[in-house]
From Swiss-Prot:
[4Fe-4S] cluster binds at residues 187, 194, 197, 203. It is an enzyme of class 4 (lyase). SMART domains: ENDO3c, FES. SUPFAM superfamilies: DNA-glycosylase. The keyword Cytoplasm does not apply. It catalyses: 2'-deoxyribonucleotide-(2'-deoxyribose 5'-phosphate)-2'-deoxyribonucleotide-DNA = a 3'-end 2'-deoxyribonucleotide-(2,3-dehydro-2,3-deoxyribose 5'-phosphate)-DNA + a 5'-end 5'-phospho-2'-deoxyribonucleoside-DNA + H(+). It comes from Haemophilus influenzae (strain ATCC 51907 / DSM 11121 / KW20 / Rd). This is Endonuclease III. Residues 108-127 form the HhH domain.
Length: 211
């Protein structure tokens, strides 16, 4: 795909959604961090159902530590892998207090040193909480980038590298949200909704479907 097409795609996505953000509900960098840890192999909707009960009770590292492991599990037991996620969250809260004065660090190395936080989670927090031009590639973004040929790559790291290379700076802060929402609601895994897609004429997918 050439540069002109990419810029037109980004322009249309921006016109459709000028101020995109995550569908996870949060009111602080810490709440976002916990929500993103919980979202691995889970839906944002499922995470929001759990955190809307958890956060009014515990939305700081110390408050979650005060809940204890079993107390935390009682709030997140509807989410897949809740046992391991609870253990990671407890460890992360302890580290935030001991190493970061209870605050979420604004750098990748410190974030990725936290339990349950990998590159993708760190990218989401840096981008969404702090406005960094990072791009977290999940299954939706991976599919959209390869299917449309916007930024094809054999794995998520390659797609991330390609996106950082081909997306102009003015679009970098928002492109993660545009692509994830496009993949979640239009360019879905099975039977993509090509007929209602605002970038259908620019997409290079050879098996477009009319829906």
């Amino acid at each position: 795909m050439n540069k002109t097409k990419r810029i037109e795609i980004l322009t249309r996505l921006r016109e459709q959604n000028p101020h995109p953000t995550t569908e996870l509900q949060y009111n602080s960098p810490f709440e976002l961090l916990i929500a993103v840890i919980l979202s691995a192999q889970a839906t944002d909707k499922g995470v929001n159902k759990a955190t809307e009960k958890l956060f009014p009770v515990a939305n700081t590292p110390q408050a979650i530590l005060d809940l204890g492991l079993d107390g935390l599990k009682s709030y997140i037991k509807t989410i897949g892998l809740f046992n391991s996620k609870a253990e990671n969250i407890i460890k992360t809260c302890r580290d935030l207090i001991e190493k970061h004065n209870g605050e979420v660090p604004e750098n990748r190395e410190a974030l990725e040193a936290l339990a349950g936080v990998g590159r993708k989670t760190a990218n989401v927090v840096l981008n969404t909480a702090f406005g960094h031009p990072t791009i977290a590639v999940d299954t939706h973004i991976f599919r959209v980038c390869n299917r449309t040929n916007f930024a094809a790559g054999k794995d998520v790291v390659k797609v991330e590298e390609k996106l950082l290379k081909v997306v102009p700076n003015e679009f970098k802060v928002d492109v993660h949200h545009w692509l994830i929402l496009h993949g979640r609601y239009t360019c879905i895994a099975r039977k993509p909704r090509c007929g209602s897609c605002i970038i259908e004429d620019l997409c290079e997918y050879k098996e477009k479907v009319e829906f």
